Amino acid sequence: MKTQNVLLSFGIVFLMISFSSETYIRDFITRRPPFGNIGKRSLKDVESLDFLFDPTFTAADLAVLENALEDY
């Protein structure tokens, strides 16, 4: 009974890790080594985050933004 609980717990944690790290079953089965992609986030759409960095912000802009968000 103890072994079954340990195996069940390990299986649940293993599934939670594999699905939370955005690895898909097809990729999980076809990649070599089979456990090499656990824990890695999906980096396919990293270029879509380029809009987060705006080099036109100055220190004055950031100070105004900080003052505006001070009460939150």
Curated annotation (Swiss-Prot):
Any coiled-coil regions, as ranges: none
Claim: Secreted is one of the keywords in the record: yes
Keyword Transcription regulation: no
Tissue specificity of this protein: Expressed by the venom gland.
PTM sites of type Isoleucine amide: 38
Localization: Secreted
Propeptide: 42-72
Primary subcellular site in the record, as a coarse category: secreted
Keyword entries, A-Z: Amidation, Antimicrobial, Antiviral protein, Secreted, Signal
One annotated GO biological process: regulation of defense response to virus
One of the record's GO cellular component terms: extracellular region
Signal peptide: 1-23
Family, similarity comment: Belongs to the non-disulfide-bridged peptide (NDBP) superfamily. Short antimicrobial peptide (group 4) family.
Its job: Antimicrobial peptide.
Extra facts: Shows a low ability to inhibit hepatitis C virus (HCV) infection in Huh7.5.1 cells.
Protein's name according to its UniProt entry: Peptide Ctri9194
The organism of origin for this protein: Chaerilus tricostatus
